[in-house]
């Protein structure tokens, strides 16, 4: 063997020497996730992203990230079977500003409502809000016994089911078409749509456990930062300054000059 051809010796290291282990978290940053102003609790938690390196920007990795949060955590409430999806639309400093992206009921709640001896009625409709968001709403309701009913079962006839389904679609369309996304979310939080449907269908067949069980976001308008800031209560539409930020006029004598400071 020729001299100087032993590659292992020239490199000066053992074969299979261990690489230096780098902690992956040392290259990452924590960002705060902020919910829109419709909810009582704005700070949802934190999310992790790799720091900006070259052309790979951290904020691009955060945009489009979806968070699923229980309504109980958003409203500091006991009722925990409603889940809201929030999507990151912009990053300001260390804050991820989110917007509504969908709603769902928990699996255990849906399973607890389905029982024997009653009719389950479902409906869905695609509706556009006044500010251009296309939503698909799903509704569910169950028949219940009439007052003083002795019979064990409470099944609705096919014609009644069709009437109730038609009424569900009408109410869902009306509630969404006439409002913008912010007002629609404000109706989904207490589920006033489900209560309206229950009230309207009493004349056809008594219902209970009526809920807007799911909301899907199908299409969004072009992203506008101003609208997102309004949702987060930071970009006031009026343009007026806050009470404590307004300036006051100061009276000065003619020919007034400020004193010369010794040090700056």
From Swiss-Prot:
The keyword tRNA processing does not apply. Coiled coil: none annotated. Residues 233-264 are annotated as: Disordered. Keywords: Cytoplasm, Nucleus, Ribonucleoprotein, Ribosomal protein. It is found in: Cytoplasm; Nucleus; Nucleus, Nucleolus. One of its GO terms (cellular component) is cytosol. Pfam families: Ribosomal_S3Ae. Residues 242-255 have a biased composition (Basic and acidic residues). One of its GO terms (biological process) is ribosomal small subunit biogenesis. The keyword Ribonucleoprotein applies. InterPro entries: Ribosomal_eS1 (IPR001593), Ribosomal_eS1_CS (IPR018281), Ribosomal_eS1_euk (IPR027500). It comes from the Eukaryota. One of its GO terms (molecular function) is structural constituent of ribosome. Belongs to the eukaryotic ribosomal protein eS1 family. Component of the small ribosomal subunit. The ribosome is a large ribonucleoprotein complex responsible for the synthesis of proteins in the cell. Part of the small subunit (SSU) processome, first precursor of the small eukaryotic ribosomal subunit. During the assembly of the SSU processome in the nucleolus, many ribosome biogenesis factors, an RNA chaperone and ribosomal proteins associate with the nascent pre-rRNA and work in concert to generate RNA folding, modifications, rearrangements and cleavage as well as targeted degradation of pre-ribosomal RNA by the RNA exosome. Component of the small ribosomal subunit. Mature ribosomes consist of a small (40S) and a large (60S) subunit. The 40S subunit contains about 33 different proteins and 1 molecule of RNA (18S). The 60S subunit contains about 49 different proteins and 3 molecules of RNA (28S, 5.8S and 5S). Part of the small subunit (SSU) processome, composed of more than 70 proteins and the RNA chaperone small nucleolar RNA (snoRNA) U3. This is Small ribosomal subunit protein eS1B. The lineage of its organism: Eukaryota, Metazoa, Chordata, Craniata, Vertebrata. The gene is rps3a-b.
């Amino acid at each position: 063997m020729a001299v100087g051809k032993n590659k292992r010796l020239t490199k000066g290291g053992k074969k299979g020497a261990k690489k230096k282990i780098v902690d992956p978290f040392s290259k990452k940053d924590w960002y705060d996730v902020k919910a829109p102003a419709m909810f009582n609790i704005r700070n949802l938690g934190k999310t992790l992203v790799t720091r900006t390196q070259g052309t790979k920007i951290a904020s691009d990795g955060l945009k489009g990230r979806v968070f699923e949060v229980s309504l109980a955590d958003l409203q500091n409430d006991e009722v925990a079977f409603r889940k809201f999806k929030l999507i990151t639309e912009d990053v300001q400093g260390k804050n991820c500003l989110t917007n509504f992206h969908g709603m769902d009921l928990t699996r255990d709640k849906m399973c607890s409502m389905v029982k024997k001896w009653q009719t389950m009625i479902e409906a869905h409709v695609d509706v556009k809000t006044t500010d251009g968001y296309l939503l698909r709403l799903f509704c569910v309701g169950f028949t219940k016994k009439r007052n003083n009913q002795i019979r064990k079962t409470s099944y609705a006839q096919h014609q009644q089911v069709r009437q109730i389904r038609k009424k569900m679609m009408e109410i869902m369309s009306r509630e969404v078409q006439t409002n913008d996304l912010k007002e629609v979310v404000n109706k989904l939080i207490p589920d006033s749509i489900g209560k309206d449907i229950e009230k309207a269908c009493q004349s056809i067949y008594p219902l209970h456990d009526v809920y807007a069980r799911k909301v899907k976001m199908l299409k969004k308008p072009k992203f506008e930062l101003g609208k997102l800031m309004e949702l987060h209560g930071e970009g006031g539409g009026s343009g007026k300054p806050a009470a404590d930020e307004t300036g006051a006029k100061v009276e000065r004598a003619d020919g007034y000059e400020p004193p010369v400071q010794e040090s700056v």
